[in-house]
Amino acid sequence: EKLERIDKVEPRLLPGVEDQVPTLFTEAGVVTRRVEETAHQAGFVFAVDPTSADASVVGGNIAMNAGGKKAVLWGTALDNLAWWRMVDPEGNWLEVTRIGHNRGKIHDVPVATFELTWKDGRHPPGATRVLRTERLEIPGSTFRKVGLGKDVTDKFLGGLPGIQKEGCDGIITSARWVVHRMPAHIRTVCLEFFGQARDAIPAIVEIR
């Protein structure tokens, strides 16, 4: 099975969020570019835009915690996930739901909360029994390394399943993403190219 289902953008009430949030459901085998195009057709932005968008699939984006240019505004895959489903090493379903999504970068919240639900993998996820549940509360600062952003060396990420694990703790099968609207006004800044990164980085930081 290729897991290529992709739905249209739809508003959803997310756990712990008062207002409806525009979301997009995809299975793990959908090519990233198709998700971008589906969101764009509805007037929204899918924030996970790696340079491999024409070749990568969203399940891989979750497993790698992929990002791209839009990560500057809305973060990486983790920041934009409302929910995801995977198969754990024992063959059971594991569904992870973000509680109180801030619709922005996850490290901006003091504590990020996730509800984990394991279901019997011998039956389809919508028609099987719940085996157990668990709640994870992880300090938002855990997900970013000060001064560097995403810490690719941290595969544990506070015990959060699936994200940045590169497939080591299970197989991603589907997800529901938060999508965004572009700001009404944008500002473009033109920068000179410097020969050395040590010269360029302080210059960028000084721009206000």
Task: Give residue ranges: language-model regions.
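FAD-binding subdomain of flavoenzyme oxidoreductases
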Residues: 3-16, 25-28, 32-207
